[in-house]
Each structure stands twice: as structure tokens, then as C-alpha cells.
């Protein structure tokens, strides 16, 4: 394509509202246009990149037996009510809902488990059809509260979602392994740094779940890695540092602690390290329309993990109780909540099990207690893993080697759902004993826009976007000084030859100076620039510069051999001989 034909626009100035680099560069380089908050027009330049990304996804999914379909975007409320997710999603305010002319409620799809389950339940005729792997690449919707992150957190976004249906847990696991490998192949082809980590299933399901994270400084998520094992910090199981505690139980003491509320204040007041103090927080657990308040005690040097609490106690939601709720249920305020004399159900982290003679609050303002012990002073609560992993914690899954902590962006998520949705929609078959058997389901998704934005976050430099070669909008930009007739003639010939060989060149035929064109090419992120400047004018040698600033000087007769080595294989053409 020629620049004069391409409908695009670059900008010198960054959008002041852009909260992340990828949003700033996508707008600046002419890839997206903001229609409204969190809603974007994908420009022709963006769509070239997206189509290449989607081609890679389709190739890898088709290779393992995936069948593409298109599911509806409008979903009847009754389908979501069947699984209990209608109210769960609406309570978060993330679901777009509407009412039709017959006064029936619908939603704009954020995900498609209900719709695909209903479809398969009507078409599945027998066990011989299993396993089934269906996928789509479609627009989805979430009413994000603060959509300031461009494609990272848009209200309307492009996503690939796969659904598998199997005759047994074993077959479901086989499908999971196939999809996991296919997703690995997709991200390997992008040549970006990513990790696969254990994750919490959230509202989707509670079976085996993993996330794919692109490593970048944006740090929307924190991930813990030890050797080949990784986990989202919300799901990471870790062994924190261990301490020795007194064997002899000392007499309990009540101590006046006026306005001593924080861990730092307690350490100073008692002249003790935080690991000898127990802190307690109250959380509100939601079960459908019912709420329950429980207290969670944890060692003073650690942070609480709301995701683990929600999972352990099988709640739909878990949040910290508000100041008003603390007064209502405990009659006290932050800083003075404790396991001693606790009027609500109490749980404690495993790290507190061996603690003796510890400091804690007793749910009375301006008072703490010293030399408190389990059993003698407080009945032992139910223990669990409620802590947030930290760098340096030991990883049980990797022989107790320490964790390293990285920042990343989640770009894909894979789940084993079991029979949660298939039971609701009676997706099943008759087994050999002619008994009705429920199918086992998996769900998988790649955020197309998020992946493209994450590539920018990881690879961009001070000159602009750096696309992976596999998805760049063009293979090479052909640049020359506007008004230089000889260079223009050579550029036109190279441009046509590249097209004939199946490559995707961009010929910048604008009547602009070379420096201007170079800056635009770098901003857009084209992997290579063929520069017809002074070197070409003086010696006839082609100057090529990669986006990573590596330079090549190539004789025109050798240029297409160079292309064969440095470009992706031409699409739809035989390799260059």
C-alpha cells in the first residue's frame, strides 16, 4: 500500500487523558480513535494488525480441531438467571442491560458460556460427537467504571473465546492441555515475553484455571514465579518466613493503647516486631442476596488475600467491611478489631497457628492485649491460607525455592468448568448403560485488543510502537526524500517487486522530507525501513534499518535474499527461490 492511499493520521501530541503508554501510542500513531470513554474506532491501520493476530489464532485453533462459529451478542436474561450470574454481574455494575419492546430483559454479552451451552444442548445427539471444540472471535461488552486504559480496559472489546464439551473429566483435561498448547503457540509466534500462571476462576468457575501474562512495567497484575511454576499473586500458595515463639505461656495483660491503630504504631508502642502481633480484619461475604461478616486474623507482617478468602469460604464476593459495618457488627472501629472476645465467626491464617504470647486487639477501643495465647485465651479458630504471597516466600510447587515477583498484563485465561453450566442447560448424552450423562466443559479466552496493547507496553521505545514482526501492519516501509525523482523511481520498482513476492510493503510517497517519514515509520512500528537516502544516491546500495536500530547495507541484487531471511514467510505465495 502507498501512504497516499492509506486513511490514517498521526499526531505529534500525546493524549493527556491516556493513563498508559499503549493508549497514548495507539492514538498518537493513528491506530484507534476515541468515540466515547472506553469505546474506540479501530482504524484501517489497526485492523491490519488485528487481522494478522486473528489469523494466527485461527491457524492454531483450527490445527487442534477447533470449529469457528458466531454466537449472538444479545442474550436473554433468563439464560443468565439460570446459572445465577445475572445478579452477580449486575451487582458489580459491569453488565449492559436493556429491555425490548415485549418488556423482556436482555444483556450485551461480556462472555458466552450460557449461550453456547444452550446451543450445544439442542444439537448434541450422542457421545460419538464428543469432544467438541467451538470458538469465535467477537465483540464483547463490560461497563467499566474507569475506562482510562485504552484497549487494556475498554467497554467494548475484541476477544477470542473457545468452549469445549467432553464426555469425562479425563477428556476435559485432554482438551484443556490441547488449548493450553495452542495458546502457547500463539504467544510464541508473537515472540514476546510471557508466563503461564495458576489463577483463581472468579465468577466463571472454580476448576483448574491458568492465566497467560505478558510481562511489562504497566503491572496491572502481580505474578509470582519460581522456576517453571508461576501463579497470580491472588492464587499463589507460599511459605512465608518462619519464626520461633516462646514455649512458656506468660500471663495475659490488658494494655491501654489510646489511638494506637496501625501496625507501625503497635510495633513502636510495644517495642516488638510485627510478626509477634496478630492483626484482624472483617470481611463481608456475599452469597447471592445474603451477606455474612467474618473476622480473619493474620500475622502482623503479612497482607490479607481477599481472593483466597472468597474461594475458601465459597462466597460470590468478598470485600473489606466498611467503618459503619464494623460499628454495627462489632461495636468498634479499625485498629481495635481482634480475635479476643470476637462476636462474629473467626478464621485465622496458618501463620498464626504456632504463635504464642502475641499482641492483639480485643474489640474495645483504645485497648490491646499482651501475651495472648490460643486455647487458653481464645478457642482455636479454623485455619486456612489467607495470605498474599510476597517476593522471597518459598514455593511449595518448586521444592521450596523462593518466589520472584513480576508485573504483568493478563491477556488470556483458561478454565476447566466441570459441569456447572452443562447441568444448568442439560448438556449431555446417553452412556453405555443408557443413562443420561452430563458433559464436562472448558472455557478459554484471548483478549485480542489487550494482547496488542500488551505488546506495545512490553516492546515500545522512545520512538514509538515496536510491533512483533508476525503482526506488524506492514513488513517494511520504503522511504525517500520527497521530490527526489531518481529515488522515487527506484522506490516504486522495489515496492512492486515486494508486492509480487507476496510481501506487504508501505511506500511512503508523500512529498515530505525523509526525516519526517522516518519518524512516522518508527511511531507506527513498522519492523524495517528501506531508506533511499545519501547512501543509495552515492553508491546505489540499499540502506535498511530495523526497528531495533540494527543497520544493513545490501546490494539491490541481494535484496530479496535478505528479505527471505528477515521477513515472515510471505502469505499466499511460495517461498522465494
UniProtKB/Swiss-Prot annotation:
GO terms for biological process: prolyl-tRNA aminoacylation. Keywords: Aminoacyl-tRNA synthetase, ATP-binding, Cytoplasm, Ligase, Nucleotide-binding, Protein biosynthesis. It catalyses: tRNA(Pro) + L-proline + ATP = L-prolyl-tRNA(Pro) + AMP + diphosphate. It comes from the Bacteria. The keyword Cell inner membrane does not apply. PROSITE patterns: AA_TRNA_LIGASE_II. InterPro entries: aa-tRNA-synt_IIb, aa-tRNA-synth_II, aa-tRNA-synth_II/BPL/LPL, Anticodon-bd, Anticodon-bd_dom_sf, Pro-tRNA-ligase_IIa, Pro-tRNA-synth_IIa_bac-type, Pro-tRNA-Synthase_IIa_type1. It holds the Pfam family tRNA_edit. GO terms for molecular function: aminoacyl-tRNA deacylase activity; ATP binding; proline-tRNA ligase activity. Its EC number is 6.1.1.15. GO terms for cellular component: cytosol. It is an enzyme of class 6 (ligase). It is found in: Cytoplasm. Homodimer. Catalyzes the attachment of proline to tRNA(Pro) in a two-step reaction: proline is first activated by ATP to form Pro-AMP and then transferred to the acceptor end of tRNA(Pro). As ProRS can inadvertently accommodate and process non-cognate amino acids such as alanine and cysteine, to avoid such errors it has two additional distinct editing activities against alanine. One activity is designated as 'pretransfer' editing and involves the tRNA(Pro)-independent hydrolysis of activated Ala-AMP. PANTHER family: MITOCHONDRIAL RIBOSOME PROTEIN L39/PROLYL-TRNA LIGASE FAMILY MEMBER (PTHR42753), PROLINE--TRNA LIGASE (PTHR42753:SF2). HAMAP family: Pro_tRNA_synth_type1 (MF_01569). Consists of three domains: the N-terminal catalytic domain, the editing domain and the C-terminal anticodon-binding domain. Belongs to the class-II aminoacyl-tRNA synthetase family. ProS type 1 subfamily. This is Proline--tRNA ligase. It comes from Chlamydia caviae (strain ATCC VR-813 / DSM 19441 / 03DC25 / GPIC).
Amino acid at each position: 500500500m502507498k501512504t497516499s492511499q492509506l486513511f490514517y493520521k498521526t499526531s505529534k501530541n500525546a493524549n493527556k487523558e491516556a493513563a498508559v503508554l499503549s493508549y497514548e501510542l495507539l492514538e498518537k500513531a493513528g491506530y484507534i480513535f476515541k468515540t466515547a470513554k472506553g469505546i474506540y474506532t479501530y482504524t484501517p491501520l489497526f485492523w491490519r494488525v488485528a487481522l494478522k493476530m486473528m489469523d494466527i489464532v485461527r491457524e492454531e485453533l483450527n490445527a487442534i480441531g477447533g470449529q469457528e462459529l458466531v454466537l449472538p451478542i444479545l442474550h436473554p436474561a433468563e439464560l443468565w438467571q439460570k446459572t445465577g450470574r445475572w445478579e452477580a454481574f449486575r451487582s458489580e455494575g459491569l453488565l449492559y442491560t436493556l429491555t425490548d419492546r415485549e418488556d423482556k430483559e436482555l444483556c450485551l454479552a461480556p462472555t458466552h458460556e450460557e449461550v453456547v451451552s444452550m446451543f450445544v444442548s439442542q444439537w448434541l445427539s450422542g457421545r460419538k460427537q464428543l469432544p467438541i471444540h467451538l470458538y469465535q472471535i467477537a465483540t464483547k461488552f463490560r461497563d467499566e467504571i474507569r475506562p482510562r486504559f485504552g484497549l487494556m480496559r475498554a467497554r467494548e472489546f475484541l476477544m477470542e473465546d473457545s468452549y469445549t464439551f467432553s464426555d469425562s473429566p479425563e477428556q476435559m483435561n485432554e482438551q484443556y492441555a490441547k488449548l493450553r498448547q495452542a495458546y502457547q503457540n500463539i504467544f510464541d509466534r508473537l515472540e514476546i515475553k510471557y508466563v503461564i500462571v495458576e489463577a483463581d476462576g472468579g465468577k466463571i468457575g472454580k476448576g483448574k484455571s491458568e492465566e497467560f501474562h505478558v510481562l511489562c512495567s504497566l503491572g496491572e497484575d502481580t505474578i509470582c514465579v519460581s522456576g517453571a511454576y508461576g501463579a497470580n499473586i491472588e492464587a499463589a500458595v507460599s511459605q512465608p518466613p518462619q519464626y520461633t515463639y516462646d514455649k512458656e505461656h506468660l500471663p495475659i495483660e490488658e494494655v491501654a493503647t489510646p489511638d494506637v491503630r496501625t501496625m507501625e504504631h503497635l510495633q513502636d508502642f510495644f517495642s516488638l516486631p510485627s510478626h509477634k502481633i496478630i492483626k484482624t480484619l472483617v470481611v463481608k461475604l456475599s452469597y447471592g442476596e445474603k451477606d455474612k461478616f467474618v473476622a480473619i486474623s493474620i500475622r502482623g507482617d503479612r497482607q490479607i488475600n481477599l481472593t483466597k478468602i472468597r474461594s475458601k469460604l465459597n462466597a460470590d464476593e468478598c470485600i473489606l467491611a466498611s467503618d459503619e459495618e464494623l460499628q454495627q457488627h462489632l461495636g468498634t472501629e479499625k485498629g481495635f478489631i481482634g480475635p479476643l472476645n470476637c462476636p462474629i465467626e473467626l478464621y485465622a491464617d496458618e501463620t498464626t497457628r504456632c504463635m504464642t504470647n502475641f499482641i492483639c486487639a480485643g474489640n474495645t477501643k483504645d485497648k490491646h492485649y499482651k501475651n495472648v495465647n490460643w486455647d487458653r485465651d481464645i478457642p482455636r479458630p479454623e485455619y486456612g491460607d489467607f495470605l498474599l504471597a510476597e517476593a522471597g516466600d518459598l514455593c511449595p510447587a518448586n521444592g521450596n525455592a523462593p518466589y520472584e515477583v513480576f508485573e504483568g498484563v493478563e491477556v488470556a485465561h483458561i478454565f476447566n468448568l466441570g459441569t456447572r453450566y452443562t447441568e444448568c442447560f442439560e448438556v449431555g448424552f446417553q452412556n453405555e448403560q443408557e443413562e443420561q450423562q452430563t458433559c464436562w466443559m472448558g472455557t478459554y479466552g484471548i483478549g485480542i485488543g489487550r494482547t496488542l496493547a500488551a505488546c506495545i507496553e512490553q516492546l515500545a521505545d522512545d520512538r514509538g510502537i515496536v510491533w512483533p514482526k508476525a503482526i506488524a501492519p506492514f513488513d517494511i516501509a520504503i522511504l525517500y526524500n520527497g521530490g527526489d525523482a531518481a529515488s522515487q523511481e527506484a522506490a516504486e520498482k522495489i515496492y512492486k517487486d515486494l508486492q509480487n513476492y507476496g510481501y506487504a510493503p508501505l511506500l511512503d510517497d508523500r512529498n515530505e522530507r525523509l526525516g519526517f517519514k522516518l519518524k512516522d515509520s518508527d511511531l507506527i512500528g513498522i519492523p524495517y525501513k528501506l531508506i533511499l537516502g545519501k547512501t543509495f544516491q552515492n553508491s546505489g546500495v540499499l540502506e535498511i534499518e530495523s526497528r531495533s536500530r540494527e543497520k544493513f547495507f545490501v546490494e539491490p541484487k541481494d535484496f530479496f535474499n535478505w528479505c527471505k531471511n528477515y521477513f515472515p514467510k510471505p502469505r499466499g505465495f511460495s517461498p522465494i527461490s
